């Protein structure tokens, strides 16, 4: 009799344990199989956020707080999540999402700056970039140049036009610093491999020339030839007479047309008036234009004129150039 009673008690206890264990397993699996609710989107994990609260916020399905706590004890590697902005996928396992938060692999935004853009264009892009801290608005050009280590206080031309990735912890100045460092490194390396006897005294003068080449080039395969024209003119002491410098010099007065008064306007960038190079670059040159400035094609051309489609007709003499102007610009025989 006593044995039967003991057996009954033990059997009941075992059944209770089995049921309880099954229930715990069921609740564990509920958490284990949770998926992200909502569409694929960016999600910001705030500093100090707790994994259990994120499970409740993001999980698609029913859970119990105690089951979530138990599940997290079984997955301690998912507890130490890192703040930041992440891309979470629609329907992805929540376990995978928490693993992403724990890894700290934030979503990377990107900014692409095009060759030939000006510093003012960069500032506009930076000001409209999402999740980027704005610090440049508080600084003058001179102050910003000083912070970046640019000696002459002028920023035009000093940033390499490329695609730059960043996360939500980045600032606009951090993007500019990387672009400046990339430009300086490429310019210095290219300067060391330059042709002999070029009419530049410093890498900065080559950067100025590269910016002019960038603005004049419509067909990439003409860069080195365009560079040769300007190098030849510098060697002969001729004025560069290039329209993009005129446009840069007249600033906001430019409305799409270059007037005769613009060509005679006395300013440091009017290469129809000044000798040699302007004082600063007129845009951000790309790598190809820097290479062309430092390794121009060997020609005896002194002039070129646009002939359509971004291409140019190159001339050796003024008479030949004037004939080309009549043919391609004035449309006269």
Residue ranges: model-predicted function:
Residues 1-241, 283-288, 292-300, 308-333:
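Conserved catalytic or metal-liganding residues and their short signature motifs at active sites
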Residues 220-268, 273:
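Small-residue-rich helix-loop
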Residues 273-282:
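Histidine-acidic residue clusters that define the catalytic metal-binding segment
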């Amino acid at each position: 009799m006593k044995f039967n009673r003991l057996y009954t008690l033990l059997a009941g206890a075992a059944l209770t344990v089995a049921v309880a264990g099954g229930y715990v397993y069921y609740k564990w699996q509920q958490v284990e199989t949770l998926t992200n609710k909502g569409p694929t989107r960016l999600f910001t994990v705030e500093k100090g956020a707790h994994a259990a609260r994120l499970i409740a916020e993001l999980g698609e399905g029913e859970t119990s707080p105690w089951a979530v706590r138990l599940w997290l004890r079984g997955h301690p590697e998912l507890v130490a999540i890192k703040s930041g902005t992440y891309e979470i996928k629609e329907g992805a396992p929540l376990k995978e999402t928490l693993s992403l938060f724990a890894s700290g692999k934030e979503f990377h935004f990107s900014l692409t700056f095009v060759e030939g853009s000006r510093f003012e264009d960069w500032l506009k892009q930076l000001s409209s970039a999402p999740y980027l801290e704005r610090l440049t608005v508080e600084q003058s050009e001179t102050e910003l140049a000083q912070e970046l280590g640019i000696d002459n206080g002028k920023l035009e031309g000093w940033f390499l036009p490329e695609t730059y990735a960043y996360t939500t912890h980045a600032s606009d100045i951090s993007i500019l610093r990387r672009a400046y460092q990339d430009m300086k490194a490429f310019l210095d390396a290219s300067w060391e491999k330059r042709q002999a006897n070029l009419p530049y005294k410093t890498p900065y003068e080559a950067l100025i020339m590269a910016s002019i080449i960038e603005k004049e080039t419509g067909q990439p395969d003409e860069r080195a030839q365009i560079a040769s024209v300007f190098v030849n003119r510098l060697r002969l002491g001729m004025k560069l007479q290039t329209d993009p410098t005129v446009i840069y010099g007249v600033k906001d007065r430019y409305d799409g047309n270059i007037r005769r008064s613009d060509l005679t306007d006395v300013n440091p960038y009017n290469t129809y008036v000044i000798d040699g190079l302007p004082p600063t670059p007129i845009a951000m040159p790309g790598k190809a234009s820097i290479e062309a400035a430092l390794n121009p094609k060997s020609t005896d051309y002194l002039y070129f004129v646009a002939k359509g489609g971004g291409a140019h007709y190159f001339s050796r003499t003024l008479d030949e150039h004037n004939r080309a102007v009549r043919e391609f610009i004035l449309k006269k025989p």
